[in-house]
Structure formats: C-alpha cells, structure tokens
Amino acid sequence: MNIHEYQAKEILSTYGIPVPRNRVALTADQVERAAKMMGGHCVVKAQIYAGGRGKAGGVKLVHHPEQASDVAKELFGKRLVTKQTGPEGLKVRRILVEETVEIAREFYLSITLDRETSRYCLIASAEGGMDIEEVAQKSPDKIHVLTIDPFTGLRTYQARKIALALGLSGAVCEDCVELILNTYKCCLEKDCSLIEINPLVVTRAGWLLAMDAKISFDDNAVYRHREYPDMVDYSQLDPLEITAGKYDLAYIKLTGNIGCMVNGAGLAMATLDVLKEFGGEPANFLDVGGGATREKVAEAFKIILQDSDVKAVFVNIFGGIMRCDVIAQGIIEAANEVHCPLPIVVRMDGSNVEDGKKLLLESGLNVQIGDNLGDGAQKIVAMLAKA
C-alpha cells in the first residue's frame, strides 16, 4: 500500500525525523496561501503515487505566491507521465507546498524488505537525490548495505557505522545515528515494506532534513492499522485494482493484450514469463489465490474482460485446494454473463481436471485446452494472431 509524500512526512515527523515546513493543498488558492506562509520562495510539488516527478515537470521552484498559484493551475488535473506510471500517467489532485532550504550535502537512505533474506535491509549512499538503481549500476562502491538481524534489531553502533561511512562527523553524525534508528523504529511499528528518504540533506546551517520521502506499507499488515484505509488516494489507483481488492484478488495492470488468470503468485509469474517467451504480451497479473470459489473466479474473469486492451484470455490453474470443475463453472458463468467473444485458452491440472475440461469444451465458448503451460501459451498466442 502506497501513500503520498506529504503523508509519509507526517508519519516520519512523529518519529522525530525532521522534515521541511510544508502544507498540502487541494486548490490553486490554497497553494497561493501556503506559499505566502512560506514567505513566497518555496517548492511546489505534485503528489502522485510515483517517482520521477521532477523530470516530468511535477516539481517547481517558485519565488512568489502568484507564481505558485500559476504553477498549481497548470498541475492540477494534469497527468504526469514518469517511468513508474506507464504511458497513461497519473492525475495530480494534491500539491505539497514546501519551504526551500540551503543544501550543503545530499544523501540517500532507505529501509526495505530484502526478499532473499526475509529481513529488513538498510541502504545508504552519499549520492543522494539520484535514482539509486542508477548509482548501483555506475558506482556500486558508493552504496552501503546492512542486513538487520530481526532478533537484535538495528543497533546504535551499526547506525553510527553507516553515518560515518557517509562521511559525517561530530554533532550531525550523531543526529544521523538517531534519525536512522528512528526510521527503523517507524518501519517496525508501522509495518512498512519501504521507507525511502531521497534526498536526506545536511543544510548549510548543519541540520538534517528529509527533503523527500516515500513509505509503502505491507498489505498483509493493513488490518492492524485502522487508519491506513483512510489514507489511500483511490484516484491514484487503477479502477480494476480497486474492484479486485474488494474480492481479495491480487491484480496488477500491465501493457499487453492477453488477459491472465492464475492461482498462486509464483505460477502467475511463470505464466507471464512463458507468454513472453512465445511472443505474447500479458495485459495483467491476476492471482485468484488457492481457495477461490466459483463466484470469485467469475468476478476475476469479469475484471479481466473489463480491460479494453484485452483481446484474448489465458487461464492457468493448478487445482490443489481448488477444484478444476469449479474453476470451469466460474469461467463459463462470467463469459456468458458478459457475452465474451474473445478467444480463451485454459490450461488446468489437478482435482476434477477432466470434469473441468469437459464443462469448458461443451460450453459453446471460443475455448481451447492447453495440455501444459507451454502448449497453452503457444495456443493463445496463435489464436490471438488469427483473431
């Protein structure tokens, strides 16, 4: 679960992490008033669920309130396109107005989940303000990584080692140690999958400030925090993702034209890879989970068909907990309800597989059965080419 920059900064500030003075605004008039509060000279920052806003024209330095208002009028309602949004971009509905500071040095700091070790990982670099992936490619020696033992937690000496590695000393070094420890505390208590501060700066006056911040929460822990659902900006989400969430379906929109329905995240990833291998382009990632009912399968299928980019559907199911005949019934029910004319290939195996195949072949749908994953992928690509 993602949140906006201004929300991330509100959370960080409650943990004693210093952030610039700021105000969030929903209208150009509010932006102008906020700019006056900042003394006129300030930064106007579009709030969207994506990075790369500066390069897309979403971050502007202004010198007086009227200019801030003019910039806001340009940004509100505009779709910002960055490398993280896809070609459709994300619409700007909120703007953060923030004071300017004189920066002496910039750093990168983040705590994220390391999937390989299943532990939190602290990443820091003296190359702040840049794309960390770019730094990793060009100057990997400038990135400092620390895997945190969950039993001992992040220790003070480890935080100090990172601060010293960034070239800090004296009082600002100790401030950085405290900031790192507080960031880790925030990660634990708020069930974050990511906290990223980029850049973390030292001002000319010698103060540390989190100039930009990103926080993502673990979706599986949201139930422990009643306030989290109210923090979601649904205007930043794909409508189909919102619908999928209501049925506890994992859905991610992609850029291709083959709709995919799979049970299990690992099998779903393998399905996307095999489709690409045979020249297909997946339109989505959709995991119905291991214990889906006929109704849930039907809703998943209807969600796929609501995407106008989808020109064919590939279903790849292993019926362990799920029965293949139940899957087939859900597909048939949904396809008939929306009068689906698209070519469909179903590859299924497991419980009641023959009953499931029989139901599909007798349904009257434009459906073929895949003998295995590779055969199914080849068939859907071929059917799409003929469509």
Swiss-Prot record:
PANTHER family hit by this protein: SUCCINATE--COA LIGASE [GDP-FORMING] SUBUNIT BETA, MITOCHONDRIAL, SUCCINYL-COA SYNTHETASE BETA CHAIN
Gene name of this polypeptide: sucC
Pathway: Carbohydrate metabolism; tricarboxylic acid cycle; succinate from succinyl-CoA (ligase route): step 1/1
Role, per record: Succinyl-CoA synthetase functions in the citric acid cycle (TCA), coupling the hydrolysis of succinyl-CoA to the synthesis of either ATP or GTP and thus represents the only step of substrate-level phosphorylation in the TCA. The beta subunit provides nucleotide specificity of the enzyme and binds the substrate succinate, while the binding sites for coenzyme A and phosphate are found in the alpha subunit.
Protein name, per record: Succinate--CoA ligase [ADP-forming] subunit beta
PROSITE patterns given in the database record: ATP_GRASP, SUCCINYL_COA_LIG_3
InterPro entries hit by this protein: ATP-grasp, ATP-grasp_succ-CoA_synth-type, ATP_grasp_subdomain_1, Succ-CoA_synthase_bsu_CS, SUCC_ACL_C, Succ_CoA_ligase-like_bsu, Succinyl-CoA_synth-like
Taxonomic source organism: Trichlorobacter lovleyi (strain ATCC BAA-1151 / DSM 17278 / SZ) (Geobacter lovleyi)
Tagged with keyword ATP-binding: yes
Co-factor(s): Mg(2+)
